């Protein structure tokens, strides 16, 4: 079964086109990286998959269901820079939010199973020792793991992440990608990223998005294609190391 099927999906913000006739199929078990310039529609695509935005035209199926019907099958990790660290909550409090039901009752409380499940997740993500720490006292990498734990607490089949390694140090970035690679053993993973340097070493397939879908396939991109999508030479994106986009030096770069 396919985890995601988008057919000719277009999304508009008033008179501005964010997505233009995007068709994309993601098989279950894939690890897809979506790259593209700022304003290219990457976050808009995630929001549309989540059912937060309604496409102006086209159709979307998540495991064969409409996004609104598949919400419990999806875990979402937003950019942590948009997460208010002043929120008075502990690591455990935030992770437990993933166990909240679709409809809350006045007397809702987490079950023992909920707490045990989340504690196990925190152990697997190597942040169990931080469970009582306030989120305002976490590093960027630690907070990102907490947000991943919250998403996994819902027991999803599809994990969507919006730039999970933005503003984290190099060591934390590598740890997060290794974690996602491990999670991909039993989850479909879709990640939005500007980090073209990780495309070849961590993900299975890549989608280049700039309002339209320019490429979807193996993570071996030519410099010309990336320049077409981003509108600038590939060496500007990879900080002087254009061959980091590919598996081996010289493959596909003229």
Predicted regions: what is each one?
Residues 4, 18-21, 131:
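Conserved structural motif at the start of ABC-family nucleotide-binding domains
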Residues 50:
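Helix-to-loop junction immediately C-terminal to a conserved catalytic motif
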Residues 58-74:
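Conserved ABC transporter NBD signature motif
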Residues 96, 110-130:
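Conserved ABC ATPase "signature" region
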Residues 134-138, 142:
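Conserved ABC ATPase signature
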Residues 159-163:
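Catalytic Walker B motif of ABC-type/P-loop ATPase nucleotide-binding domains
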Residues 222-254:
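ABC ATPase nucleotide-binding domains
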